[in-house]
């Protein structure tokens, strides 16, 4: 019989998958028996598994078909030491971030989605995703920590775009499509094409 904590975690994963399905109009599901199938000590499995299998077992949520680079880890806990976000290290959050990054590939859009009893729901994304809007957020070790509903209201389209494409590296001859550019639409298209 699963523990109450495992049941709580699985329920939160299903809730997140259902919410993402509603937002994007495509099916997101909880990874069956989620729990580091290709992360942690099982990272070696990436060497011999097909890319489609890796995408399926990465994180806690199997993303819809248009978002192959979305990597989501979900956490549901009784409490969280919010005051430590401003005053020092949050070892629990560091562990969770490491779990996300442990199964991540270079081009993934990594997210940590959390829920705490009587405290609310939150999202943390990496700083490298610079195109996101926040009404309020806290930056913790290169991750932006913000309120769940507000995050999705402001950023659902950007998350779809950034998790749908493999991000190109900036080189001397080409600007990255993920690099912010300023100017007219025609200039942006010209910059990307050259």
PLM regions: where:
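Catalytic phosphate/metal-binding cores of nucleic-acid and nucleotide-processing enzymes, i.e., regions
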Residues: 1-194
